[in-house]
A protein has these predicted regions:
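ATP-binding pocket architecture of kinase catalytic cores
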Residues: 1-116, 159
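Active-site acidic catalytic loop and adjacent metal/ATP-binding pocket
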Residues: 2-7, 15, 146-199
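Glycine-rich, phosphate-binding/catalytic loops in enzymes
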Residues: 32, 80-81, 183, 200-202, ...
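Short helix-capping segments at alpha-helix termini
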Residues: 39-43, 139, 219-222
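Short, hydrophobic secondary-structure boundary micro-motifs
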Residues: 46-47, 73-76, 107-112, 184, ...
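An alpha-helical support segment within catalytic cores of ATP-dependent transferases
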Residues: 53-56, 68, 78-90, 101-167, ...
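Helix-rich C-terminal or lid/interface subdomains of diverse kinases
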Residues: 189-192, 200-276
Length: 276
């Protein structure tokens, strides 16, 4: 997407214009979904005013009032002490639960795709073995394959009621005003699938203790099964980024993703010997 900010009569608006078919489909899907989803979500999310002809590519552009708040990097979240505030974890917990409470059947009617993680990760493994493992030190390559196999082999990892998920709940998609979360953006990956996946990017970006507090507010536990899933996803996401960099001939992105993958593998082994 190309996103630009515009000021009209003193109010700020966002104009998003897709460059490809996937982006066009995403905007059309969001236009159908977000108006209904916003009814049950306390935090501000994009509320489309209208769509119109897209001047730079397929589909339509969308226009909506700018969601209040600013995007902060992980260091700034920590410098402001936001991850230690109970209200931060509570706001995230309420948002996640509100999204999950939206009717999955209605989401299907609105065109939200379904995610079959067991099938997709099984298909990805062959490519990971062929293209990603050779870029890693031998021990790290074996560790990644081990994590992948453990995830796929545990039936309990796939025993869940499919729900609507944001699927990209990360610190840079939670907008902050002062010391509180005021909005959530980037619904481009929304899908029907494993509810645990909405903790994936918080696990890698905000840390285990923050995820534990989110789960406490949700009345749920952070047990060993969930920890293992989150550890796997944190590594698999970077491995798939490596594949993306290779497929699209983006050597810098590929190399950055390899470094991120190695760091994620190191964190997994560090956490597995810690107090969790």
């Amino acid at each position: 997407h190309l996103a630009v900010s515009a000021v009209v009569a003193g109010e700020r608006f966002v104009v998003r214009m897709p460059k490809g078919e996937d982006g066009a489909e995403g905007i059309a899907r969001e236009a159908r979904l977000l108006a209904e989803l916003a009814v049950g979500v306390r935090l501000e999310i994009p509320r489309y005013l209208f769509t119109a002809v897209n001047p730079i590519g397929p589909g339509e552009r969308c226009v909506y009032p700018e969601v209040p708040g600013e995007v902060l990097g992980g260091r700034e979240w920590r410098a402001r002490g936001l991850l230690e505030r109970g209200e931060t974890a509570r706001a995230v917990a309420e948002f996640v639960d509100a999204v999950h409470a939206f009717s999955a059947e209605r989401a299907r009617e609105l065109g939200v795709p379904e995610w079959d993680p067991r099938t997709e990760f099984a298909e990805d493994l062959d490519l990971v073995r062929a293209q990603v493992i050779p870029l890693l030190p031998e021990a790290e390559g074996w560790r990644l394959v081990e994590l992948w196999g453990e995830y796929l082999s545990v039936d309990g990892n796939f025993e869940y009621e499919p729900v609507l998920t944001h699927a990209d709940v990360s610190l840079d998609h939670l907008l902050v005003t002062g010391d509180r979360i005021t909005g959530v953006i980037d619904f481009g990956d929304v899908r029907i699938g494993d509810p645990d996946y909405d903790l994936c990017y918080l696990w890698s970006g905000a840390g285990a203790e923050f995820v534990r507090r989110v789960q406490d507010y949700r009345g749920r536990s952070l047990d060993e099964r969930l920890i293992a899933k989150l550890e796997f996803w944190s590594c698999a996401d970077h491995a798939i980024d490596v594949l993306h960099g290779i497929e699209h001939e983006l050597p810098e992105f590929r190399d950055d993703s390899v470094r991120e993958l190695r760091a994620a593998l190191a964190r997994v082994d560090g956490q597995s010997t810690g107090s969790l």
